[in-house]
């Protein structure tokens, strides 16, 4: 972004990836952003195009269809999305969060079943944590999954679901033991195509937001939804809270990286504006206040 700055974590491979991502976004995403913001979500085939370009699940092992990269590869993608002003592509949830729950806790069968399709874009995923009455207090979730024979019966409601209108695979935080607190929480994967409509699963409205206009953020509802018991992540009930706590630090770091990239983008736009705009026949960059603030931001942007 800034000519004289070289990030300490970038290497030649990441620079090559950054250039490829930049070109892909400029060709396939940027021209459609205005329309996507009006319709409230990106086009479904944009996921398939990203998968074909190798931009989904870049830090998932190649044996499961992923890119075989690491967290740095995910960060390059996060940054380039911010630099290109792409606000609606929920790939951080899809690739950076849900895919890693499956890769970390899923059985070999679950990994082989879902991860390759997530990497190709055939599957779009979401994670359902937040509920209307509990916010981010995960121990207090009210959505239940009660074992009944070979299935779990899900009942409850989730909200603020990124990719909520598009996702066909959702990692749902549930109580398999409603009488317990943290130790009653489990993670269950819901394949929506088999339960939507008459199966008791439904999607609510696409929520209106102040920003992220092209990102579908939704409510979802479970009314006696039957999910095969084999869709439990980790094979043992009650492990969900520990799984969440193990993954949440990385999830928060993804958010932080995106925020830093957004700040960097705002700085660039501001610098360009200051250079170009005249203010009472005096350019803004001659203002002591503007110069001092810009210098402060540039010096501290990577701290």
Model-flagged regions — what are they?
Residues 68-78, 137-141, 221, 227:
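Structural signature of FAD isoalloxazine-binding scaffolds in flavoprotein oxidoreductases
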Residues 143-145:
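A structural signal for short hydrophobic beta-strand segments in well-ordered beta-sheet cores
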Residues 121-129:
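A short, Trp-centered hydrophobic/proline-enriched beta-strand micro-motif
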Residues 284-303:
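Single conserved hydrophobic/aromatic residue that forms the stacking wall/gate
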Residues 151, 155-202:
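A short core secondary-structure module
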Residues 52-122, 162-169:
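Internal helix-loop-helix
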